[in-house]
């Protein structure tokens, strides 16, 4: 190892270690704030959100308190006083904002946004599965490794297990807590990239937008929160013309504070992601860690983020080659020095891109290896239809900057800032590449509809809004600074701008419960795992699940995780960790499970003419046969309401009913038990 290598390794270790230490401290603060807040909310019997405005009012009060903490932190930073207290206030303020914005409206229910309906059902099922055991197992099917990334759910399962909670019951506090942690981690990352007072403001803006538009899908919202600073970090890792020995263009020049007040408040401004002493390798490691995290949490956002980072790498390589050519042009009074082919200038950013990919792949392998290995050796027909969904939002380009709203105005400011500062701001370049990547992905998603699939571009609204809102926050601050200078630095101007910013933020923040009203209402109208509705109205059929669970365990004599149940009421599997013979729809089914083949087999079973024939068919099943059937009862028949993919239609699912004659189970090999509207049929060994 050379002296130069040692000189870079030590700062790298110091920077990474310091960043990790600060991130751990911030995460602990977020966990404490979220835990204290959620416990405090649970101590009072609140009225339901959908029948009273009490929780909405208290949410607004809590948001004002959180905003006050953030303002206090910014004031301390600008006055260069009590930096540790300022950091603590900023972490607590962001975590409190997340906790009160989501936790207070949901205070009277045990369910998270959207209850256990639609997509939230399979997410709850996944968390229940990984609460029951840390082993990587499919959410529904026995003996198959999971296809959907298990990272967020695995951590949640371990949290639920430590707390002694059922998976469904831990979903809400874990989702809110994980979002609080992600928000403060984004703040920590921003403070490593830009001046601290700006970092607090930018994080607050992107967090508010993420809560409004990404929070129902909590595990993806974690990536949305981290995406903006991660892209800036990635650009700092890949585009380092000075560090690579080339002539720096304007885009690589630091962006220092320009006013006297800013110079006093911030002694130095970060113009690149990592100080040059580390050679950008700290940013490389950080970017790889982010992409690895995305790979273990949410495949779609991994794809988009990796696409954006790849575009950055190619752009950085192009700029490096161009800069190398410029250095070889003869100038008056200077000689041209040949240093080898100009294409070699592209190697440093491409090498860094490769290292980022390797780091991400190593992390992704933790959750992806089992299913990839199984796919390589399995002969089961692939049946995944996860990409078969094209709502109207996926057939149009999202243009939030043209909407007449507070968020639309912020996105418009962000769009203008991205264009104006594209040649002079590394932040604008990084965020701009991210926005460009999303629009290119959206167009590609529309294009591949001709091939019978999509790239689910409709789910990119949240990251797009987060990026544009982040850019809008920068645009607002820099625009206000420019106006301040143009007006000869009037005495009260900055105070007026700050007041307008705070009022605008509060106006948007207090509207978040309204934006999430359908999701919050569903959390109160769905029947939870205790068989109750939080709005105190009569519960649905799920109130019989506890009795069904008891009968199942008594009649089979096996643990839940060793029992396979065929049922169309898959919410039962979300509350109890039984394996299912068939998933809710093919879109959530593991491709290794052969959803279509199982559906055809179920129909064949229903058409058999005797119990003996059914017993024989179950014994010959190519998959592990059901140990129990959970039907809806309809006269002398037992029914299952199943689903099939009808893409490209919207809705993309058609429900159909399969009926089993009750006489088909009139045999000592089967035990039938009527429980409420259900009939439970267990199969004797």
Which sequence ranges carry the predicted segments?
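Active-site lumenal/periplasmic loops and adjacent helix-entry segments of GT-C-fold
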Residues: 101-224, 534
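Internal/C-terminal transmembrane anchor helices
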Residues: 87-99, 356-360, 364, 489-515
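Transmembrane catalytic cores of multi-pass membrane glycosyltransferases
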Residues: 112, 119, 218-223, 292-432
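Membrane-interface junctions at the ends of membrane-embedded or membrane-associated helices
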Residues: 76-80, 236-283, 315-348, 469-495
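Short periplasmic/luminal acceptor-recognition loop of GT-C membrane glycosyltransferases, typified by
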Residues: 504-606, 617-648, 668-683
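Membrane-embedded helix bundles of polyisoprenyl
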Residues: 94-101, 179-318
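Membrane-helix boundary/interfacial segments in multi-pass membrane proteins
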Residues: 48-59, 112, 164, 212-222, ...
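Start-transfer (signal-anchor) and selected internal transmembrane alpha helices
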Residues: 1-33, 40-107
């Amino acid at each position: 190892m050379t002296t130069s290598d040692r000189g870079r390794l030590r700062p790298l270790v110091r920077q990474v270690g310091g960043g990790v230490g600060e991130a751990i401290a911030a995460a602990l603060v977020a966990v404490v704030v979220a835990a204290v807040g959620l416990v405090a909310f649970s101590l009072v019997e609140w009225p339901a959100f959908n029948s009273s405005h009490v929780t909405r009012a208290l949410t607004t009060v809590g948001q004002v308190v959180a905003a006050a903490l953030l303002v206090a932190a910014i004031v301390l930073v600008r006055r260069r006083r009590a930096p540790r207290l300022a950091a603590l206030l900023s972490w607590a303020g962001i975590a409190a904002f997340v906790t009160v914005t989501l936790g207070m409206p949901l205070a009277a229910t045990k369910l998270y946004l959207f209850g256990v309906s639609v997509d939230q059902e399979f997410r709850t099922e996944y968390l229940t599965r990984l609460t029951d055991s840390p082993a990587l197992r499919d959410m529904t099917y026995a003996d198959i490794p999971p296809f959907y990334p298990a990272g967020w759910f695995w951590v949640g399962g371990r949290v639920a297990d430590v707390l002694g909670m059922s998976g469904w019951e831990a979903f809400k506090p874990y989702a809110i807590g994980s979002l609080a942690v992600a928000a403060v981690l984004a703040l920590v990352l921003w403070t490593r990239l830009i001046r601290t007072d700006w970092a607090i403001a930018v994080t607050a803006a992107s967090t508010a937008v993420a809560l409004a538009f990404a929070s129902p899908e909590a595990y993806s919202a974690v990536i949305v929160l981290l995406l903006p600073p991660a892209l800036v970090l990635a650009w700092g890792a890949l585009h380092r013309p000075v560090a690579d020995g080339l002539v720096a263009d304007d885009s690589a020049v630091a962006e220092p504070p320009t006013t006297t007040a800013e110079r006093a408040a911030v002694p130095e401004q970060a113009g690149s992601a990592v100080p040059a002493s580390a050679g950008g390798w700290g940013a490389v490691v950080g970017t790889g860690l982010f992409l690895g995290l995305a790979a273990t949490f949410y495949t779609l956002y991994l794809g988009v983020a990796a696409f954006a980072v790849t575009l950055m790498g190619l752009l950085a390589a192009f700029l490096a080659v161009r800069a190398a050519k410029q250095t070889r042009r003869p100038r008056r009074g200077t000689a041209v020095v040949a240093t080898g082919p100009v294409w070699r200038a592209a190697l440093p950013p491409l090498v860094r891109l490769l290292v980022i990919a390797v780091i991400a792949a190593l992390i992704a392998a933790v959750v992806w290896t089992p299913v990839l290995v199984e796919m390589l050796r399995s002969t089961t027909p692939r049946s995944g239809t996860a990409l078969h969904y094209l709502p109207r939002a996926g057939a149009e380009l999202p243009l939030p900057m043209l909407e007449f709203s507070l968020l639309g105005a912020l996105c418009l400011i962000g769009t203008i800032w991205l264009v104006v500062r594209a040649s002079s701001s590394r932040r604008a370049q990084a965020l701009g590449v991210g926005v460009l990547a999303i629009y290119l992905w959206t167009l590609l998603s529309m294009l591949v509809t001709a091939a019978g699939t999509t790239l689910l571009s409709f789910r990119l609204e949240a990251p797009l809004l987060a990026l544009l809102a982040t850019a809008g926050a920068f645009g607002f601050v820099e625009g206000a600074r420019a106006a301040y200078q143009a007006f000869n630095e009037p005495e009260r101007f900055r105070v007026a701008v700050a007041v307008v910013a705070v009022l605008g933020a509060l106006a948007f923040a207090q509207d978040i419960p309204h934006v999430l009203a359908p999701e919050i209402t569903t959390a109160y109208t769905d029947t939870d795992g205790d068989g109750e509705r939080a709005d105190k109205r009569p519960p649905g059929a799920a109130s019989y699940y506890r009795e069904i669970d008891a009968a199942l365990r008594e009649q089979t004599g096996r643990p839940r995780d060793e029992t396979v149940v065929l049922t169309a009421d898959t919410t039962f599997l979300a509350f109890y960790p039984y394996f299912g013979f068939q998933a809710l729809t093919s879109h959530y089914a593991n491709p290794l499970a052969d959803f279509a083949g199982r559906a055809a087999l179920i129909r064949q079973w229903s058409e058999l003419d005797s119990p003996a024939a059914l017993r024989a068919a179950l014994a010959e099943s190519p998959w592990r046969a059901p140990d129990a059937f959970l039907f809806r009862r309809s006269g002398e028949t037992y029914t299952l309401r199943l689903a099939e993919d009808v893409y490209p239609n919207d809705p993309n699912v058609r429900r159909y009913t399969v009926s089993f004659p009750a006489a088909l189970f009139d045999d000592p090999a089967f035990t039938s038990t009527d429980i409420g509207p259900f009939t439970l049929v267990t199969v004797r060994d």
